[in-house]
């Protein structure tokens, strides 16, 4: 059992705490699922891009799915090899494209004809041939939250089958483009295997047609990730996920790329916060804690529910429903409504669970609140992997503007 009391003697709340052994196990389970087939697991940095987490994964020979040049440089800084990095995203700037090509990453996932022509022009100016993949929108409902559904025709992502074919043929004729992969991504937090299999089958059929047309594909890039059980939902078994993709690719000698993020890091993380006050307003019980929606946005943005565990011994205290809320000046600054928790006192510590994904990576300084300390638990030892911001950090980049005022 982990000794939180020792932790509280040296570190003030709120802070993120990650169990690195859980991250290792989650990543290695993906490698095991695709064992025996050419594959590359490209961790999706958007889930959590802390350098120490990336370094841990780099040592396990992870690739990286990046959606900005900043993420690419983070991956490289952490030791992930350029030939294991794919660059996705619907709005890559010319600067980002040029940098990615100079770094000689594995390939760029292209999302429009205009982007394709931009890449070609930049590749021509550099005197190189750009490896590209085209993101196909299979128009399949991922059955997930609408904010993170990406595979329907009304979504901004990817291109339809007809346009994809035109883009591949156009790229094939170019002296500065090398089409090497097909890609699709139907959404995040996937709890139903059927849409993934359907999309894999549909895009695999397209891949076979492209190969028949003389396009030398080498990769089959499956975006999106297996969901996590936040509310005791039934999740997809990793073996079934892998077998579904492998079965769809029968007859295709392509390296499989998958891009998990949430399922690698979510369950490793806790947000540790302490009670500031208890209050009752019109018979409603509120527990006010020192973490806020700026630190962890998912409950406010997605109405996501994360279990809350009381760390401080509370045996014998009366249990009743309450809303656990933060100090930010918005009613949406609520971590969990109607949580059945014991009576709590100022200084009591609680843990918000499964926050390793889309927690710190979506944090902000809203209300001029410094970003949090982040800690790693590895081999029974605690170490700091991100320092807590100081108050001075809130305005450090603005001070130059005061000169001459």
Task: Report each predicted region and the residues it spans.
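A charged N-terminal "starter" segment
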Residues: 1-130, 172-178, 205, 209-212, ...
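Conserved, mostly hydrophobic/aromatic
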Residues: 23, 46, 68, 100, ...
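Short acidic, glycine/serine/threonine-rich loops at helix termini
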Residues: 54, 77, 97-102, 119-122, ...
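Active-site loop/helix belt of alpha/beta enzymes
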Residues: 139-277, 341, 367, 378
């Amino acid at each position: 059992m982990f000794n939180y009391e020792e932790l509280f003697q040296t570190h003030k709340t709120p802070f993120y705490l990650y169990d690195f052994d859980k991250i290792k196990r989650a990543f290695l389970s993906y490698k095991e699922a695709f064992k025996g087939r050419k594959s590359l697991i490209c961790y999706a940095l958007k889930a959590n891009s802390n350098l120490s987490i990336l370094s841990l994964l780099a040592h396990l020979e992870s690739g990286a799915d990046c959606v900005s040049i900043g993420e690419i440089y983070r991956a490289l800084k952490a030791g992930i090899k350029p030939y294991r990095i794919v660059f996705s995203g619907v709005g890559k700037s010319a600067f980002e494209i040029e940098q990615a090509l100079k770094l000689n990453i594995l390939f760029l996932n292209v999302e429009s004809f205009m982007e394709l022509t931009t890449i070609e022009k930049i590749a021509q100016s550099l005197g190189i041939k750009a490896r590209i993949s085209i993101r196909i929108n299979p128009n399949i409902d991922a059955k997930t939250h609408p904010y993170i559904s990406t595979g329907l025709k009304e979504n901004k992502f990817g291109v339809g089958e007809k346009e994809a074919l035109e883009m591949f043929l156009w790229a094939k004729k170019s002296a500065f483009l090398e089409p090497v992969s097909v890609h699709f991504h139907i959404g995040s937090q996937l709890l139903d295997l059927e849409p993934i299999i359907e999309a894999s089958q549909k895009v695999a059929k397209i891949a076979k047609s492209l190969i028949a047309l003389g396009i030398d594909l080498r990769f089959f890039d499956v975006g999106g990730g297996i969901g996590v059980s936040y509310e005791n939902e039934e999740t997809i078994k990793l073996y079934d996920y892998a077998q579904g993709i492998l079965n769809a690719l029968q007859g295709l000698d392509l390296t499989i790329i998958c891009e998990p993020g949430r399922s690698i890091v979510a369950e490793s993380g806790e947000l540790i916060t302490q009670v500031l006050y208890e209050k009752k307003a019109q018979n409603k019980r509120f527990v006010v804690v020192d973490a806020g929606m700026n630190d962890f946005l998912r409950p406010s943005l997605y109405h996501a529910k994360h279990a809350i565990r009381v760390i401080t011994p509370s045996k014998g205290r009366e249990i009743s429903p309450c809303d656990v809320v933060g100090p930010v000046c918005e009613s949406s600054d609520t971590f969990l409504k109607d949580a059945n928790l014991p009576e709590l006192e100022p200084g009591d510590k609680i843990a918000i669970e499964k926050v390793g994904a889309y927690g710190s990576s979506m944090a902000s300084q809203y209300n001029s609140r410094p970003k949090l300390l982040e800690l790693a638990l590895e081999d029974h030892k605690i170490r700091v992997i991100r320092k807590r911001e100081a108050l001075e950090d809130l305005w450090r980049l603005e001070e130059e503007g005061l000169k001459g005022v």
